[in-house]
């Protein structure tokens, strides 16, 4: 028998729109299209004034305002599940306790490594970094000022994770965690999270953007222009190509000036800046290949499955979750992360093997339809919600955190 659910979805979005925001919106659209009721509380980091960033980091430990907001919403409706996509920094873990007060199951999607790493990426100074992974107090991150380049702000973030680790929030106030890949699940288990509270469910692309034909012939990069995304490696690889080929770059970020300067000297490379989702889908469908050169442990790499949905194969770093998302030599190619020479070699392969690339287009689209489209993904999400509800019924109610404990 069909059982429609009533879900309260929470998400704190960043100042620059990214994959987490699109993934949250896709799940909301998917659930509603499947007949479930979804209400949202969406907070945007644009509310943060630069002069208050340290204060906001401190507030991330416990936001009474967010607790009251969720408490009030739960009193007004009969919700089955509180699904938190990202609570940092304005919502805070206080929202879990509001749900516990009302006996509502809590699900947290692990869209980043915030609970394991103050700077969220497990990446520092151009290299992977796991110094804080298993530590209750993330003192290496504090020493390096990993959050916004500030030791004080990093200490505030580290205090949040340490406080809630010691209090038992991650263990007792969340009924179920959704990891996007087995790699992410394993990382959180390595950091001490209980394996029986971690399930794997990938991102979804909904609605279906439709399959393109790759007739534009260009290569495409879509993402934040920042060091961990590997855009510098991509530009170095492009300089090594032995023939002319157009590269289109979509996105913005701290490396925007570098990309702009590179484009001024290399007419085959075009920086388009940020673009709306519908336009990005069209660009993907017309591309010969999408390049995903990330140098951090992507929790998923959403743009890869968006590309698969349009039938466009992907060249991705052989790193972390990216090894799981596609199938090498069927939906794209993998290269050694940070190795511009290897990436250039893979780009040449795409140019030299048009028939195989056409076959990859078919397989990429098929993979999307079987693994990343709506029906299977929604089934897995509902199963996760039902698992969380069972766990919630067995859990002891938790009231509001008393001020003397803070």
Model regions: which residues?
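Donor nucleotide-sugar binding/catalytic pocket of nucleotide-sugar-dependent glycosyltransferases
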Residues: 115, 130, 134-210, 270
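Acidic donor-binding loop of glycosyltransferase active sites
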Residues: 285-299, 312
């Amino acid at each position: 028998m069909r059982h429609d659910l009533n879900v309260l979805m929470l998400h704190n979005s960043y100042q620059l729109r990214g994959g987490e925001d699109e993934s949250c919106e896709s799940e909301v659209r998917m659930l509603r299209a499947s007949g479930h009721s979804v209400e949202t509380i969406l907070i945007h980091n644009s509310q943060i004034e630069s002069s208050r960033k340290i204060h906001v980091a401190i507030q991330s430990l416990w936001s009474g305002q967010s607790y009251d907001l969720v408490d009030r919403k739960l009193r007004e409706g009969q919700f089955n599940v509180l699904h938190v996509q990202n609570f940092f920094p304005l919502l805070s873990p206080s929202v879990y306790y509001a749900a516990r007060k009302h006996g509502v199951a809590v699900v947290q999607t692990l869209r980043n490594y915030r609970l394991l790493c103050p700077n969220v990426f497990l990446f520092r100074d151009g290299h992977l970094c796991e110094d804080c992974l298993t530590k209750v107090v993330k003192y290496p991150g504090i020493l390096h000022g990993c959050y916004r380049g500030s030791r004080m702000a990093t200490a505030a973030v580290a205090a949040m994770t340490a406080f809630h680790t010691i209090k038992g929030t991650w263990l007792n106030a969340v009924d179920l965690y959704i990891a996007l890949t087995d790699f992410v699940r394993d990382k959180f288990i390595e950091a001490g999270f209980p394996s029986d509270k971690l399930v794997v469910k990938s991102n979804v692309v909904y609605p279906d953007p439709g399959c393109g034909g790759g007739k534009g012939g260009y290569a495409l990069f879509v993402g934040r222009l920042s060091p961990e995304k590997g855009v510098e490696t991509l530009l170095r690889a492009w300089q090594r190509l032995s023939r002319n080929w157009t590269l289109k770059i979509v996105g913005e970020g701290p490396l925007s000036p570098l990309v702009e300067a590179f484009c001024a000297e290399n007419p085959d490379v075009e920086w388009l800046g940020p673009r709306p989702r519908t336009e990005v889908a069209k660009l993907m469908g017309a591309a010969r290949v999408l390049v995903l050169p990330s140098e951090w442990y992507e929790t998923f790499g959403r743009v890869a499955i968006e590309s698969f949905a349009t039938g466009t194969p992907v060249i991705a770093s052989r790193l972390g979750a990216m090894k799981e998302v596609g199938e090498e030599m069927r939906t794209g190619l993998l290269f050694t992360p940070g190795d511009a020479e290897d990436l250039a070699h893979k780009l040449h392969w795409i140019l030299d093997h048009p028939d195989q690339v056409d076959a990859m287009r078919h397989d990429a689209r098929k993979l999307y339809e079987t693994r990343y489209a709506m029906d299977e993904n929604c089934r897995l999400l509902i199963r996760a919600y039902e698992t969380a509800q069972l766990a919630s019924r067995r859990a002891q109610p938790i009231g509001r955190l008393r001020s003397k404990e803070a």
